[in-house]
Amino acid sequence: IEESIRKGTGTYQYGNGESYEGKWVNGTKEGQGKMFYADGSCYDGDWVCSKRHGKGKVVFRNGDQFEGNFRDDKMEGKGTYTFADRRVYTGEFKENKIEGEGVMTLPNGDKYQGKFVGGVPDGKGLYSFSEGNEKFDGVWEGGKMKNGQFYFKNGDIYNGDWKDNKMDGNGMYIFMNSEKYEGEWSEGFKHGKGKMTF
């Protein structure tokens, strides 16, 4: 067997310090294999034509981990990403990014379930707080609340516009005692024209 054509199962050490343990077919990584990268990360899973493709797991140098589907050497499809800071995302990925429908659970127990774009909530989603049964159900933009209903732990409900995660714009606030304010808001406070119903 010529040295340049690797086949079967074995270990290959690259000149840059990287190494591969697994199956070879006609000189390419094919099937199950484990790759240790120069940046300190490690991939263990399926290979097709020397690219990560299929099921696999990556452990990154910073402690982050991903387990799920790969396509053409990138995280693609369904998977679970566990951050070093203990945030856990389970859902869809596109070209190595959190993209699509998924669930993000924070270390404090807060949970967001809905649409993600570029790794942050964007689109329709439900954010549930771990304490007090508070939640926001509505539309997100760039990781911030944009429009929807917020349910407060005391029973109050706000339905309307948001800016920088504060009530801002037009909205209706229904108090637990059935009193209601409908009108304009600014930075979390009633501001401008509005109507109070007792």
Each model region followed by its residue ranges:
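Glycine/tyrosine- and acidic-biased, solvent-exposed loop/turn segments at the edges of beta-strands
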Residues: 1-198
